Amino acid sequence: HVSQFGFDSRVVSAVGRDELGEEILKVFNEKKLKMQIEQVDYPTGTVQVTLDDEGVPCYEIKEGVAWDNIPFTDELKRLALSTRAVCFGSLAQRNEVSRATINRFLDTMPDIDGQLKIFDINLRQDFYSKEVLRESFHRCNVLKINDEELVTISRMFGYPGIDLQDKCWILLAKYNLKMLILTCGINGSYVFTPGVVSFQETPKVPVPDT
């Protein structure tokens, strides 16, 4: 999406030295997407999808895979030194190897005006901890979170108040954020900056019955 707006961007991750890994690299090259994807001695990441008796899907994110083990290479260090905006999540930090790489990348980025370190929380299964979340809050200056994740975070950190906006103001101030983006599904989205909040309704889009 960023590259489609004309910006010089990279996808950073890791794949295995296997058929799935080769397929991913081939697709990225065919689409001419710039990437920094290392091949490592772990299987390419997969998600196992099963359906319950009512047809509701259940997702199992496999562990011990390539993207759990993204190395911090010299090439990645050079990329960090020239990066002005980065987006990272919590799921990719479930393993200490990729977590250390993400943190080193963030710490290596130059401290310049307009720099963006966007933490897009993605709480999946039990792949998150208070420690990892707290570190990420301190390292980011923009936080993107949905309403369900905000409830979970508030419970974990003991933030008071019932109103979701109150909790957003607490996070914005506590971690000195430039911006907090709260998405609420069909109920719209909010953008918080120091002293200002704006709201955007969710567009009404006709969805075909499949």
Task: Give residue spans per PLM region.
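Short, charged, surface-exposed secondary-structure boundary motifs
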Residues: 70, 153-155, 207-210
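Short, hinge-like loop/turn segments at secondary-structure boundaries
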Residues: 27-30, 52-56, 135-137, 160-163, ...
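Structural beta-sheet core signal
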Residues: 11-13, 119, 182
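Beta-barrel outer-membrane channel/assembly domains of diderm bacteria
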Residues: 1-5
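Conserved phosphate-binding/catalytic region of the ribokinase-like
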Residues: 161-210
